[in-house]
């Protein structure tokens, strides 16, 4: 029986210059665990695969770490979603039996979110998407 873990997180180096810059700033000040977290989230290669093997994990279904792209202005979120999805798609192509992807989409730009999801699912084999429960401070179930 295969062991598949769901919604395992990843990040790209660019993600730590954008929505997760607070983690990078903290890592630069104190190092330690913050630097380790950044390194581990960005690793979609030998180190992660080794940890998966050691834990008996055959496959990870990966999604972008919090805070996602939902806190960004729509134009920035569109670019960050594409970049982080490209980063994930590259890892899935290199290790298709070990990684599967869930897309990040710019929910503040609905048309582009649909385009990004279609591109990732139809053309790159992503399994779906992850939508965080809020967009720039507004929860999905807030009254409009």
Regions flagged by a language model, labelled:
Residues 1-144:
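Helix-coil boundary/capping segments in enzymes
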């Amino acid at each position: 029986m295969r062991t598949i873990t769901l919604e395992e997180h990843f990040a790209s180096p660019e993600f730590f210059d954008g929505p997760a810059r607070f983690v990078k700033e903290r890592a630069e000040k104190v190092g330690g665990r913050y630097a380790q977290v950044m390194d581990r989230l960005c690793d979609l290669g030998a180190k992660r695969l080794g940890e998966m093997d050691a834990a008996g994990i055959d496959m990870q279904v990966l999604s972008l770490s919090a805070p996602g792209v939902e806190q960004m202005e729509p134009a920035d979120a569109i670019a960050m979603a594409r970049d982080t999805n490209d980063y994930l798609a590259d890892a899935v192509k290199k290790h298709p039996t070990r990684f599967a992807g869930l897309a990040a989409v710019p929910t503040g730009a609905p048309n582009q979110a649909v385009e990004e999801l279609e591109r990732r699912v139809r053309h790159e084999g992503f399994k779906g998407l992850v939508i965080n429960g809020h967009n720039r401070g507004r929860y999905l179930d807030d009254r409009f």
